[in-house]
């Protein structure tokens, strides 16, 4: 079996998972601090997807911790395929939510009376954190997909 850095069961994967959780939590936190986020569908979508990404990554971080502690590589192709597909789905959803939230922030910024600068900055920072979550999620998916052929 080929050792791919960033694939399930490695310390690099654990780092990616923890990074995804922290960024998703930060995005969720900055979005929900704003009192009016529920008025915009894109912001509600971002909150929903980041709320979904946190337990997904927490579960896979526990799998990584288990594999790292036992020093066993993850060698189950079907489960790895399911994890890769799940990461890809979370990645696409995170990109869609980050893009839609960033678009709404740009529209709100053009009309300063509808969004005070401090609130718009929070929303923009939440969208930025969601983009970073997407990047780490895509990385995890690609690393696991890269490992998959060596297990089959």
Swiss-Prot record:
Main location: membrane
Topological region Cytoplasmic: 1-17, 64-78, 150-152
Residues modified by glycosylation: 111
Topology of this chain in the membrane: Multi-pass membrane protein
Keywords tagged on the record: Cell membrane, Glycoprotein, Membrane, Transmembrane, Transmembrane helix
InterPro entries with a match to the protein in the record: CASP_dom (IPR006702), CASPL-5 (IPR045009)
Cystine pairings recorded for this chain: none
TM helices/strands, residue ranges: 18-38, 43-63, 79-99, 129-149
GO cellular component, one term: plasma membrane
Tissue and organ expression note: Expressed in the floral organ abscission zone and flower buds.
Subcellular location: Cell membrane
Topology, Extracellular side: 39-42, 100-128
Family the UniProt entry places it in: Belongs to the Casparian strip membrane proteins (CASP) family.
Subunit structure: Homodimer and heterodimers.
Record's protein name: CASP-like protein 5C3
Organism in which the protein naturally occurs: Arabidopsis thaliana (Mouse-ear cress)
């Amino acid at each position: 079996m080929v050792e791919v850095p960033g694939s399930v069961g490695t310390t690099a994967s654990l780092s990616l998972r923890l990074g995804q959780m922290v960024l998703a939590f930060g995005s969720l936190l900055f979005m929900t601090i704003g009192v009016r986020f529920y008025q915009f569908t894109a912001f509600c979508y971002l909150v929903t997807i980041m709320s979904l990404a946190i337990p997904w990554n927490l579960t896979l971080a526990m799998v990584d911790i288990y594999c790292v502690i036992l020093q066993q590589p993850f060698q189950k192709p079907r489960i790895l395929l399911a994890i890769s597909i799940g990461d890809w789905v979370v990645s696409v959803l995170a990109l869609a939510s980050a893009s839609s939230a960033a678009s709404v922030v740009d529209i709100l910024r053009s009309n300063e009376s509808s969004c005070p600068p401090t609130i718009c900055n929070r929303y923009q920072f939440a969208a930025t954190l969601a983009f970073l979550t997407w990047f780490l999620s895509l990385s995890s998916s690609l690393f696991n997909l890269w490992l998959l052929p060596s297990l089959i």
